[in-house]
Design a protein with these regions (language model features):
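A short, charged/proline- and glycine-enriched loop
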Residues: 127-134, 236
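Long helical/loop segments within the catalytic core of UDP-sugar-dependent glycosyltransferases
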Residues: 117, 190-195, 209-229, 234, ...
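N-terminal membrane-anchoring/stem segments of glycan-assembly enzymes
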Residues: 1-124
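The conserved acidic donor/metal-binding loop of glycosyltransferases
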Residues: 244-248
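Short aromatic/hydrophobic "clamp" motif used to bind/position activated sugar donors
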Residues: 240
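Active-site beta-to-alpha loop of glycosyltransferases that engages the nucleotide-sugar donor
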Residues: 131, 138-153, 173-174
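Short, acidic, metal-binding catalytic loop of nucleotide-sugar glycosyltransferases
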Residues: 129, 151-166, 189, 263-264
Length: 299
């Protein structure tokens, strides 16, 4: 029987409460222990302080190394022509014959050749690239067109064909008339750009819901499911991406995800996490927020 992994409602068990408290207790205990040891024995306090500083230094070096390493990987991946690689998957036999002896050192090129070889041998098990669609769902509350517009523009300017992108603007009714007007204006502005531009208004106070982005996108997802059924689109070949209203998608992101989706045999049970860089409006944010944003980008 499948175990329920949801957060329990109501009273927790003693073990559950203990495990909830443990991370915070360890964090606060580590700080309190420094003062306690200093009162008991200054030498022990000094040794403990040195251990804390040394461990922090080691972690800082590790983060710095991984950050530089990750940056290099990102840059290598950005230099790849993902649109061309996706197009290669349409004709795996020809592409494999053309590339198998190529001494290309680009990001995951050898894996690309292996994928072509595998698809050439078992083509029916893989979807054709022209049968793959992206549903891009953007959650909004009360943001204006100056925030939402550039985010939609970034989706429009990706290398993935716009006629295979279904854009969904999921906005909150509690956002008022302003967001409803913004949504309608954006739909008119981007009419004909994507395969379709859907507006989904999330009602207030639905039973069993909490206020937040999750219920908004869940409600929109149900509307998209009905849309896909009405349009007879291949639901097994649809990739769903959720965005905040200020997220700017990288130009090659959709092609990169489509490539991974097509070439993976267990594609229906995959989820994709992009590298999030919190800096598209960093100069408009207060200094403390900038520090937090840069730190979050490191991780």
């Amino acid at each position: 029987m499948r175990k329920n992994l949801e957060i329990p409602q109501g009273k927790r068990t003693k073990l559950y409460r203990f495990l909830e408290i443990l991370p915070g207790a360890i964090s606060y205990g580590a700080i309190i222990l420094l003062f306690v040891l200093s009162l008991i024995d200054p030498v022990l306090g000094a040794i403990y302080l040195f251990i804390l500083i040394a461990s922090t230094l080691v972690k800082a070096i590790g983060v710095a190394y991984r950050t530089v390493q990750g940056y290099e990987v990102i840059k290598r991946a950005e230099r790849v022509d993902w649109r061309k690689r996706v197009e290669d998957l349409s004709h795996p036999h020809e592409a494999y014959e053309r590339l198998r002896d190529d001494n290309n050192k680009s990001y995951h090129f050898e894996q690309h050749v292996e994928n072509l070889k595998m698809m050439a041998a078992m083509g029916k098990e893989y979807p054709s690239p022209d049968k793959v669609y992206h549903v891009v769902m953007m959650a909004a509350y009360n943001e204006g067109p100056e925030i939402i517009g550039p985010s939609i523009e970034a989706v429009k300017n990706t290398t993935f064909p716009n006629d295979h992108i279904i854009f969904v603007l999921a906005y909150e009714r509690r956002g008022g008339e302003a967001i409803a007007t913004t949504a309608e204006n954006l739909k008119k502005q981007y009419k004909g750009v994507f395969r379709d531009f859907l507006l989904v208004q999330h009602p207030d106070n639905l039973p069993g819901e909490v206020v937040g982005k999750g219920p908004n996108l869940t409600y929109a997802g149900k509307a998209v499911s009905r849309y896909v059924a009405e349009k007879h689109l291949p639901v097994e070949n649809i990739i769903v991406t959720s965005l905040d209203s200020d997220n700017h998608m990288a130009p090659k992101y959709l092609d990169s995800v489509a490539y991974e989706f097509i070439t993976h045999p267990n594609r229906q049970r995959l989820s994709y996490q992009p590298v999030s860089l919190f800096m598209n409006n960093i100069w408009d944010a207060p200094a403390p927020t900038r520090v937090i944003a840069v730190s979050n980008s490191f991780f």
